[in-house]
């Protein structure tokens, strides 16, 4: 989920009031519902033909945590749209895996963490990449099994430019590094759910 300036989020509201509302938020979910939910629905109505979520494949327990894996066209908006649709179903928003190559300013790094994002390190050596993948896998398993918090992760690095939306092998290998048991047990532990985007942008 995301946020811009206070005139966009709360038009006509003085900054002092906006600041008080922000300080009143005690959790990341409260922050997202206060500042991001309405903005994202407003944006969706302006630039898409509509958003829908087929949640029938999910168990009835809305408090359960899942790993959502999908293609993406805009990593912030796609995961944000998923979150507001989940909120409408009475479910929690998702933590988002976001590459550090997108954190071009220090304030962006702080802001995405407020919005339940965790950082995926890029431009690493092979050894560093293996260590980072193992660390992230352990965190994702912990987030699903201990924090009971759902996660969204792109199925491949970058956008698919040739209509090839197959999940990158390295993503599945990363998920299987952490956790206990054999590879199948580890993948089942993160309760992964494959999604595919069908939004059509309005002209």
Write out the residue ranges for each language-model feature:
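Extended hydrophobic secondary-structure segments that form protein cores and membrane-embedded regions
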Residues: 67-69, 96-98, 152-155, 189-196
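Flexible, glycine/proline-enriched loop segments at strand-loop-helix junctions
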Residues: 123-130, 159-165
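Conserved short loop/turn motifs at secondary-structure junctions
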Residues: 58, 100, 158-160
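Loop-centered beta-sheet repeat module
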Residues: 136-188
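Conserved small/polar residues in nucleotide/adenosyl-binding loops
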Residues: 1-6, 193-200
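Basic/hydrophobic alpha-helical interface regions
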Residues: 94, 131-134, 138
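Membrane-anchoring hydrophobic helices of lipid-metabolizing enzymes
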Residues: 1-66, 72-83, 87, 109, ...
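Catalytic core of membrane glycerolipid acyltransferases/transacylases, capturing the structured
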Residues: 60-125, 129, 176-186
């Amino acid at each position: 989920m995301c946020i811009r300036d206070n005139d966009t989020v709360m038009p006509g509201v003085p900054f002092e009031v906006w600041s008080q509302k922000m300080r009143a938020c005690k959790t990341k979910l409260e922050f997202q519902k206060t500042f991001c939910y309405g903005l994202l629905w407003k944006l969706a109505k302006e630039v898409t033909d509509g958003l829908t979520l087929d949640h029938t494949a999910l168990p009835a327990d809305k408090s359960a945590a899942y790993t959502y894996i999908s293609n993406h066209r805009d990593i912030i908006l796609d995961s944000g749209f998923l979150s507001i649709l989940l909120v409408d179903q009475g479910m929690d928003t998702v933590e988002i895996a976001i590459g550090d190559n997108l954190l071009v300013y220090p304030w962006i790094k702080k802001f995405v963490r407020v919005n339940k994002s965790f950082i995926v390190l890029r431009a690493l050596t092979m050894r560093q990449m293996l260590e980072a993948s193992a660390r992230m896998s352990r965190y994702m398993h912990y987030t699903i099994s201990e924090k009971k918090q759902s996660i969204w992760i792109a199925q491949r690095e970058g956008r698919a430019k040739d209509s090839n939306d197959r999940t990158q092998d390295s993503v599945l290998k990363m998920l299987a590094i952490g956790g206990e048991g054999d590879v199948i047990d580890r993948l089942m532990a993160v309760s992964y759910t494959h999604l595919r985007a069908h939004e059509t942008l309005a002209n």
